[in-house]
């Protein structure tokens, strides 16, 4: 539904040049729109409280999140709820509830077999509401396990709107359609239409925010065809997620199934890989149906495992990787009019090239990412605050950023 408006580009360049003569030389935010990067609460304040709970989202907002992220799956009675996966045997206390013991089964999702598990589509919303959410990552607080319910999308939206009024700042939501190909099969098996999952999301968001690209909402997915479909149904901002299996010693990305390509591509025996999506040609393709990309962070900053113990702790691990700088993906994405929101930053894991989580985030912010997903909202907020920004210059440029943002339109499919 959107495509670039090229007439604005000369205007923006001329205005920027004029401003540069009026303001002392300085660096503003190197983001697509010139505004400060977003801090996106990955699954809520999941570093502190059980993920995808209203309490976790509220905590993230209290810590300063700009957006909260509900991953979405669907119940047996067609309600969209927030869970990271359709699999709920480990993220809830369902295994301890005898009345649901007969729901344990084995299913395959995106080529991966889940044995002796419980699946959200086998429960009604009323049944899910009797479960309690649990912490899913080892080493994190567990004292709240079982205390918080699984929220619906409607409840997440209501929370964001209420907190926006309470705090006086706009709190957005960043829903992800989880495993769309799988959920389309679920929809059909339950008697709903093939695109019910996507259509239900769109109708819910339009009712809450309207059909506009300025809504405080992003819709994200690792698949392609569902985003292309959504591009024909909504003006709400769309984000193509980009995955990989691992990062190699030389800094390249390992592409091993099922993390080598979007699953809707895989089921058609297509050749398009995730790495292809962040090539120059791939980014041009993504710009025809989406507004931004959400790549795993090693796609953006090259780090190399060269065997040097840089932290001096006697163990050579990911934190010791040599940082070689930008891969160029951010710059190329911006050149294609795409913003870049990267993931996932954690205080307790997954640091590459840094032994301080805030410093790692700062490195990506300085490269120009437009947003960061983190389990620890407070660290993300501190990282944004720590990156210098001349206020006067930034405010002037933010006005130009709005012009550029409004001028960009996705191609109509």
Segments (PLM) and residue ranges:
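Short, charged juxtamembrane terminal tails flanking transmembrane helices
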Residues: 410-413
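Short alpha-helical segments used as structural interaction elements across diverse proteins
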Residues: 6, 39-40, 405-407
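Phosphate-group recognition and catalysis centered on beta-loop-alpha active-site segments
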Residues: 15, 26-386
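Gram-negative bacterial Sec-dependent N-terminal signal peptides
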Residues: 1-27, 400-402
């Amino acid at each position: 539904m959107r495509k670039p408006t090229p007439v604005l580009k000369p205007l923006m360049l001329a205005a920027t040049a004029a401003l540069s003569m009026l303001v002392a030389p300085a660096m503003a935010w190197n983001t697509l729109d010139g505004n400060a990067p977003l801090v996106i609460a990955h699954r809520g304040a999941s570093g502190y409280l059980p993920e995808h709970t209203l309490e976790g989202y509220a905590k993230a907002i209290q810590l300063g999140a700009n957006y909260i992220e509900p991953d979405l799956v669907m119940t047996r009675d067609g309600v969209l709820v927030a869970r990271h996966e359709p699999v709920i045997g480990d993220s809830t206390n369902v295994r301890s509830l005898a009345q649901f013991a007969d729901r344990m089964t084995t299913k395959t999702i995106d080529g991966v077999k889940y044995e002796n598990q419980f699946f959200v589509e086998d429960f009604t919303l009323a049944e899910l509401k009797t479960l309690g959410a649990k912490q899913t990552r080892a080493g994190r607080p567990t004292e709240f396990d079982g205390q918080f319910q699984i929220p619906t999308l409607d409840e997440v939206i209501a929370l964001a709107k209420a907190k926006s009024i309470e705090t006086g700042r706009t709190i957005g939501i960043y829903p992800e359609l989880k495993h769309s190909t799988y959920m389309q099969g679920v929809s059909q098996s339950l008697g709903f239409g093939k695109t019910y999952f996507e259509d239900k999301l769109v109708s819910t968001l339009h009712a809450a925010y309207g059909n506009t690209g300025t809504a405080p909402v992003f819709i994200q997915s690792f698949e392609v065809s569902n985003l292309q479909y959504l591009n024909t149904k909504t003006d709400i901002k769309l984000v193509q997620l980009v995955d990989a299996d691992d990062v190699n010693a030389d800094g390249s990305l390992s592409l091993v199934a099922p993390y080598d390509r979007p699953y809707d591509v895989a089921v058609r025996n297509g050749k398009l890989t995730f790495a292809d999506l962040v090539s120059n040609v791939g980014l041009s393709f993504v710009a025809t149906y989406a507004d931004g990309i959400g790549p795993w962070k090693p796609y953006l900053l090259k780090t190399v495992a060269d065997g040097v113990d840089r932290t001096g702790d006697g163990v050579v691990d990911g934190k010791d990787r040599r940082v070689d700088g930008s891969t160029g993906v951010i710059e190329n994405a911006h050149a294609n009019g795409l913003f870049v929101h990267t993931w996932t930053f954690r205080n307790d894991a997954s640091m590459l090239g840094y032994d301080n989580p805030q410093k790692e985030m700062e490195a990506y912010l300085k490269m120009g990412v437009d947003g960061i997903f983190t389990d620890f909202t407070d660290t993300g907020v501190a990282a944004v605050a720590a990156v210098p920004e001349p206020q006067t210059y930034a405010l002037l440029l933010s006005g130009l950023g709005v012009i550029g943002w409004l001028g960009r339109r996705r191609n109509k499919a």
